[in-house]
Amino acid sequence: MLSKKLTVDKIPHMIKNKRVLVRVDFNVPIKDGKVADPTRIVSTLDTINFLKENGAKSIVLMSHLGRPKGVRQEQFSLAPVVPALEDIIGQKVNFLNDCIGTEVEGEVANTKDGNILLLENLRFYLEEEGKGVINGEKVKADPTKVESFRSQLTRLGDLYVNDAFGTCHRAHSSMVGVNVDTRAAGFLLKKELDYFSKVLEDPKRPLTVILGGAKVADKIQLINNLLDLADEMIIGGGMAFTFNKVLNNTPIGASLYDEEGAKTVHGIMEKAKEKGVKIHIPSDFVCAESFAEDAKFAYKLKMKESQDGWLGLDIGDKTIRSFDEVIRRSNTLFWNGPSGVFEWKNFAKGSHAMLQAVTESTKNGTVSVCGGGDTLNLLKQVDGAKENISHVSTGGGASLELVEGKELPGIKALSDIN
């Protein structure tokens, strides 16, 4: 249960004079030796400030950057993060040139009260991920060395805080191997847990799930798990053509068709019927002569009228109105995937209309949670859209696995609330 995990706001009385080891996600883009986008650093500020305000003896930050695959490579050093981190928190940060070892332990033990330290990239060691590449060969870490690595990390803190949701689906040493008594979620991770529990554990009804994406096969676990939870489900994106062809035997021209996923469509519909979930698929589309931004296109072209060679790239006006009604009668929304090729202006209308319906519903009290890279890119196209969604997940693969019903190792490793 996500809502039963210990969060840092529950333990202010335990922080004073303690060394707090914090797993953050500073996997930020570096350009010309500087941080190009500090968003992930900024997102940890609430947790760092809370630990400072409650008298932590020291705050030891650990992270990965890039994919060095178990070998020290200076291009993946966390050193360039330090100036950006200092600007954001308004305090000097001591950067350590390693993440384990006697020198690191000595620095942490002897640091002045109130200091913040940043360890070097965890993934310079095979033992963090448990595998890597050495001299072009894939290798697995020695289990004995993994245990030693985890023990050395554990010696750096009295308390452990995890604020790296995006890595919670990985059973990496820094996520599951810090063996201290108190292991709490930071504020960034807490927000993810709070909002996903509102979708997965205690949603305000009706709960509507909006799914896009190219292939049914890629979303089958997600769909199956959400059918146990949802009241209504909207199927958009490339998946819609597979559903239409299988269920209605409609010609789809050159539109995307997922042969593997097609085998699962009837099973999905049977489960939906059994669970009482209404599934909505598009009834009209915007089609193009070819898959190109400047292709000749036609509005409101029903698929049964679609010429061979044409392909659907967005939903049509009738579908927009239908989906709009479903969204606006919902009290909880989970959105993963746009309805069309929104990157191209001629095929963005459907996705933008759905975004408008979601944001306006949110303003009226609906709880809305969005996740997935394409959905986030859509939000970036519209000024102020992100601020009008209840929660935009930073998790990527972690949020996807959570909604698929999987237990995330990084969350499982947190202490339970007593």
Swiss-Prot record:
SUPFAM superfamilies per the UniProt record, alphabetical: Phosphoglycerate kinase
Highest taxon of source: Eukaryota
Molecular function via GO: ADP binding; ATP binding; metal ion binding; phosphoglycerate kinase activity
The protein's assembly and partners: Monomer.
Swiss-Prot/TrEMBL GO biological process terms: gluconeogenesis; glycolytic process
Annotated ADP binding sites: 213, 237, 342
Binding site for AMP: 214-215, 219, 238, 312, 343
UniProt-annotated binding residues for (2R)-3-phosphoglycerate: 24-27, 40, 63-64, 66-67, 122-123, 169-170
GO CC annotation terms, alphabetical: cytosol
UniProt entry keywords in alphabetical sequence: ATP-binding, Glycolysis, Kinase, Magnesium, Metal-binding, Nucleotide-binding, Transferase
Record family assignment: Belongs to the phosphoglycerate kinase family.
Entry binding sites for ATP: 214, 219, 238, 312, 343, 374-375
Protein name: Phosphoglycerate kinase
Positions contributing to Mg(2+) binding: 214, 217-218, 374
Species for this entry: Euplotes crassus
Cofactor(s) required, per the database record: Mg(2+)
E.C. number(s) listed in UniProt: 2.7.2.3
InterPro entries in the cross-refs: Phosphoglycerate_kinase (IPR001576), Phosphoglycerate_kinase_CS (IPR015911), Phosphoglycerate_kinase_N (IPR015824), Phosphoglycerate_kinase_sf (IPR036043)
Pfam hit, one: PGK
Record pathway: Carbohydrate degradation; glycolysis; pyruvate from D-glyceraldehyde 3-phosphate: step 2/5
Catalytic function, reaction form: (2R)-3-phosphoglycerate + ATP = (2R)-3-phospho-glyceroyl phosphate + ADP
Main enzyme class: transferase
Residues annotated as binding CDP: 213, 218, 237, 337, 342
